[in-house]
Swiss-Prot record:
A Pfam family this chain is assigned to: Ribosomal_L32p
Family matches, as NCBIfam families: rpmF_bact
Gene Ontology cellular-component terms listed: cytosolic large ribosomal subunit
Similarity-based family: Belongs to the bacterial ribosomal protein bL32 family.
Keyword terms of this UniProt record: Ribonucleoprotein, Ribosomal protein
Biological process according to GO: translation
Phylogenetic classification of the source organism: Bacteria, Bacillati, Bacillota, Bacilli, Bacillales
PANTHER family per UniProt: 50S RIBOSOMAL PROTEIN L32, LARGE RIBOSOMAL SUBUNIT PROTEIN BL32
Organism: Listeria monocytogenes serovar 1/2a (strain ATCC BAA-679 / EGD-e)
Protein name: Large ribosomal subunit protein bL32B
InterPro entries, per the entry: Ribosomal_bL32, Ribosomal_bL32_bact, Ribosomal_zn-bd
Length: 57
């Protein structure tokens, strides 16, 4: 099995891993109360989705 001839430096390793990161969830402002909520989810603060009261009915 092949073995690296030279050790990979910290800089080289970190430059390679710049694209390895966590993705932030897609957040939107609620059109009713202005709080941030996940896309395509009911607002946890006011219970509305797509302009309709869903959670409190």
């Amino acid at each position: 099995m092949a073995v690296p001839f030279r050790r990979t430096s910290k800089a080289k390793k970190r430059k390679r891993r710049t694209h390895v990161k966590l993705q932030l969830p897609g957040m939107n402002e609620c059109s009713n109360c202005g709080e941030y909520r996940l896309s395509h989810h009911v607002c946890p603060e006011c219970g509305q989705y797509d302009g309709k009261d869903v959670a409190n009915s």
